[in-house]
Amino acid sequence: MKPKILPLPNGPYYLINDSTRTRVPNLQGNNGEPLSTVVGIALCRCGQSKNKPFCDGTHSTVGFSSKNNDNDQPVVNKRKSYVGSKITVHDNRAVCAHAKECVKNRLAFDLSARPWINPDKDTVESIIETVKSCPSGALSYSIGGVEYRDQTREPMVTVSKNGPYVITGGVELMGDSVFGEGASLEHYTLCRCGASKNKPFCDGTHFEVNFTDS
């Protein structure tokens, strides 16, 4: 059974490792009935817990809001396709967490060039590996009219250094969160600094606010 993540309103992420209700030892109701719950942990997403990555309740004292604006509107999609002779790269800037993994490949991904993605400047194999390195799911690629965006791997939540939670392996994001157009459901990044304008997803704002694990 794969884990799930539930972003609680104005509160932490609840990582549910086992959604099967399990009896809690040494706990009962007032009539002596056994009490059970799912197995999970609360992960900080306000950015100010003194016990990161775990929630310590600080969100309630700092006035953390899980909304992005007064209307709590989802981010506007910015998906574009960059067509090459052998491979097409799809990119949604609105989903990007600005991890900068893609620009390590300066041949096909060059922020100083226009267009900044040119699939014909590198090999198909290299471009595929670059797309796979994108943690946010903003990048995907098509070959022969078939789009590829997901990978096969075990579910995992990784606490990146001074950055977001990196989700891989198809961990289900519960609730009404809106994924961007073309975004991967298998891998994505969740805001940990509390300042993203696209909550619950990371938009790179942790760089602007100088978020740290300490």
Predicted regions and their residues:
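Short Fe-S-cluster ligation motifs
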Residues: K2-S19, Q73-E101, K121-G145, E154-D176
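Short gly/acidic/polar-rich coil/turn motifs that serve as flexible hinges in modular proteins
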Residues: G47-S49, G194-S196
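Short, structured motif recognition centered on aromatic/hydrophobic residues
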Residues: Y13-L15, I41-C44, P53-C55, L139, ...
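Polybasic, low-complexity binding patches
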Residues: K67-D70, G145-M156, S214
